[in-house]
């Protein structure tokens, strides 16, 4: 919300006349690979999500709308606790409206082989590592740098166990689910091609780009 300069949480802002969250929810609703959807939101938004997202748009696969936590990893863990009788979980940012059924399919084929995979795309920009003073420390080879997206897909037992383990430690600096699995299990995680269009809407400029994607 801060970077968007809005009092409304970014996933509830509208593009194309519908909340940003609607588009990814619709995709998972349509995919035959997805059995259940668990929607994690702020405690004060549960009622809104139930009536204005789930019921309004007929998202019948939503089996639970639950409260998240202060940090992203708290919310992911809350969602994992709601899962029942599942082999795999897709963890997706509600502010990424352009996930596709093809991505869901690619992720499923990968996770069946590896138990852990994440969507991403090779970086189009040169990336620099900085020292604490703001000077360039190193330039990684762009050929091996990927920008990571969601969904991130894991076998349920693997991701649940990794979160159970890391919650006993200092989680400062944990930025995504793959990092939790890397640190706590040592599992190799496969990179699966997502899409350059699979952006996370964070700033007003992103909103304008998303509107353009919907038009064209």
Give the positions of each predicted feature.
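Conserved beta-loop-beta/alpha segment of the NTase-like Rossmann-fold superfamily
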Residues: 64, 70-130, 149
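Conserved alpha/beta core of the MobA/IspD/sugar-nucleotide pyrophosphorylase nucleotidyltransferase superfamily
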Residues: 146-216
């Amino acid at each position: 919300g801060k970077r968007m300069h809005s009092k409304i949480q970014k996933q509830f802002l509208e593009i194309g006349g519908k909340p940003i969250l609607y588009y990814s929810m619709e995709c998972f609703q349509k995919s035959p690979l997805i059995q259940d959807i668990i929607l994690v939101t702020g405690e004060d938004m549960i009622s809104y999500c139930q009536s204005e997202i789930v019921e309004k748009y007929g998202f019948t696969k939503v089996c639970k709308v639950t409260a998240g936590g202060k940090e992203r990893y708290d919310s992911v863990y809350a969602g994992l606790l709601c899962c029942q009788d599942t082999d795999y979980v897709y963890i997706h940012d509600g502010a990424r409206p352009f996930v596709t059924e093809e991505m869901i399919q690619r992720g499923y084929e990968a996770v069946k082989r590896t138990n852990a995979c994440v969507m991403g795309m090779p970086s189009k920009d040169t990336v620099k590592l900085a020292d604490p003073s703001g000077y360039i420390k190193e330039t990684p080879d762009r050929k091996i740098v990927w920008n990571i997206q969601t969904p991130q897909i894991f076998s349920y037992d693997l991701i649940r166990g990794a979160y159970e383990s890391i919650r006993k430690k200092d989680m400062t600096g944990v930025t995504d689910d793959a990092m939790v699995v890397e640190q706590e299990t040592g599992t190799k995680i496969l990179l699966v091609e997502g899409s350059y269009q699979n952006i996370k809407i964070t700033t007003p400029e992103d909103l304008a780009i998303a509107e353009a994607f919907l038009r064209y």
